[in-house]
Amino acid sequence: MLISIIVPIYNVQEYLSQCLDSLEGQLDTNMEVILVNDGATDNSLAICEEYAQKHSNTIIINKENGGLSDARNAGTMVAQGNYIYYLDSDDWLAPDAILTLYDYAVKNSCEIVQGGFYYAYEDYLLYDNSIKTAQVLNREEAMLELIKNESVKDFSWGKLYRADIVKKHIFPKGKYFEDSYWQHIVVHDCAHYGIVPTPLYYYRQRSTGISGTFSLKSLDLVQGYEERLEFIKGYYSNYIAEMVLSLWDTFYSLMSVANKQEDYKKAFEDYWEVLNEKYGSLFEKYLSSDLRFRIRKTYPSILPLYDFILRIKSRIKSSNLVKISLK
């Protein structure tokens, strides 16, 4: 068996058929599709069963709801492929996505290959075309790019992994933003990280914005980056400065949202004290030139004005994305 495609599923009946239909035409007898029903209460299981009746290389796993990480782990444990691919059940693939990544992995001896992707909105697609050509990074290069979340993206979907690597490292159960706990570990086990910039994955953007999905569980992302910082301190000491900045950037972005929501503002203020106690010396050492950090320590009352300036800059940066209308 060459490739196992793992699809975690929970209450996505509205999108699941499009996801599974996108696999048509790119499967052969050397591939298997593992559909992990994570305790869905809608019509998702019936859609899975209908798909499995038409495709003999499909396995359905039924389990109690345990979250995305637990569902991925369940699929990974039974996967027979030499490579594993994670496809989220509300997203979908371009034709030949799987074989494109597989061919590149074999040709370039890559343990992981990342494909390009679209941000898929209802009426249009967005594509970041900053990476112009395919490339192979070594372990150190890939880790630095992951820390900066630039050419190596901090997500698990849309990448082809050699199975022996991911089977060693399970996803953390019960965590939001599970990738922040996991990606650096598998990249560390990767001598050759391939990047194919061609957009092969459609990453569905729901209508609910960050304010609508924001909660205290958003701190899981910060805690994942805290674990990553400790990992970087142990294995990649030359990258501590970049990782400290990444941790600070992440917390600052979440704090900016929390400040607008009374339910969460104090909790994030309290967590800032925890972070500052743990990493204050590193912040002082590596963030001395970061204006946001200096403002937060000295003139916190003017942070809203500075946030406004940052939002303007963010819009300018996002204008570099290629927009493709669907109507």
Q: Locations of the language-model features?
A:
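Donor-binding/catalytic cores of nucleotide-activated saccharide
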Residues: 68-69, 89-194, 204-215
